[in-house]
């Protein structure tokens, strides 16, 4: 199967700043009960995804392009760059910020945690 990539502009995600572009590589239906989505996320300059907690899900991020700040479960601010992997476990919180003048591009996958009803 070949289909067009589904895209959506979302504003102030999880209380963050500005607009981000969500590109859905796999939708919830295509995840076959294993998670919510696999996507490419573009954070334009000076935008962010606000800090939030994952309940019943885990989320690995892979940084493809640009540089940013990963805010971990303890609110520690950690610089990230291409090739870095950020893993958010069930019950942990995180946020992602792009304080630069270039796009920050990540691949993220929201998967159901252990014991999560699918």
Which ranges hold each PLM region?
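A short, N-terminal "cap"/entry segment at the start of jelly-roll beta-barrel domains
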Residues: 1-36, 50, 117-118
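Short acidic-glycine-tyrosine-enriched beta hairpin
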Residues: 74-90
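Short, surface-exposed secondary-structure edge patches
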Residues: 40, 60, 75-78
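A short hydrophobic beta-strand segment most commonly corresponding to one strand
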Residues: 60, 87, 102-117
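A generic "binding-loop/recognition-motif" signal
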Residues: 45-47, 56-57, 76, 92-93, ...
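Short, conserved beta-strand element in jelly-roll/cupin
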Residues: 42-44, 53-70
């Amino acid at each position: 199967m070949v289909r067009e990539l589904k895209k959506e502009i979302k504003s102030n995600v999880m209380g963050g700043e500005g607009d981000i572009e969500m590109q859905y590589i796999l939708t919830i239906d295509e995840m076959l009960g294993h998670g919510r989505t696999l996507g490419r996320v573009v954070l334009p300059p000076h935008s962010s995804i606000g800090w939030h907690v994952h309940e019943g899900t885990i989320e690995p991020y892979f940084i493809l392009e640009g540089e940013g700040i990963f805010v971990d479960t303890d609110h520690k601010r950690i610089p990230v760059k291409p090739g870095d992997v950020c893993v958010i476990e069930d019950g942990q919180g995180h946020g992602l910020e792009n304080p630069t003048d270039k796009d920050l591009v990540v691949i993220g996958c929201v998967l159901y945690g252990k014991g999560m009803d699918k």
